Amino acid sequence: MPEPARPAPAPVPVHGTLLAFDYGEKRIGVALGNSITRSARALEVIPNRSVEYRFTQITRLVNAWQPVGFVVGMPVHPEGEDQPMIKLAKRFGNQLHGRYGLPVTWVDERYSSIAAQDAGATDDVLDAEAARIILQQFFDESHA
């Protein structure tokens, strides 16, 4: 079966809240940011127990924060090759787009977890801190 197409990158809305995700098979880090202030903060870690549980928790966050879009980290190998997790992250991003109808933007996250560890993030918040780094990178690099 062919792999679902990646959602087309969408421009950052002029203003609004964005949710960012560091997708993992066991945990999903979530960060919150604002395109006006261009700042991000770690929000929480969602245990990736099942599709139903995952999206119940994400729906709770979408309802609470009313984002205008999502940023999803794409796990790319340091030499630019696809990591095995990239298919799962793509599927997750496609599911976000399909369920909520919001634009999904992809960010190279190859060093986000290492940067979170280097910043002193503890295991219980490591994935949320990695999501914060992904979102801050999104603000800093490509969307002036």
Curated annotation (Swiss-Prot):
The keyword NADP does not apply. It is an enzyme of class 3 (hydrolase). GO terms for biological process: rRNA 5'-end processing. GO terms for molecular function: nuclease activity. It is found in: Cytoplasm. Gene3D superfamilies: YqgF/RNase H-like domain. One of its GO terms (cellular component) is cytosol. Keywords: Cytoplasm, Hydrolase, Nuclease, Ribosome biogenesis. Its EC number is 3.1.-.-. PANTHER family: POLYNUCLEOTIDYL TRANSFERASE, RIBONUCLEASE H-LIKE SUPERFAMILY PROTEIN (PTHR33317:SF4). Belongs to the YqgF nuclease family. This is Putative pre-16S rRNA nuclease. It comes from Ralstonia nicotianae (strain ATCC BAA-1114 / GMI1000) (Ralstonia solanacearum).
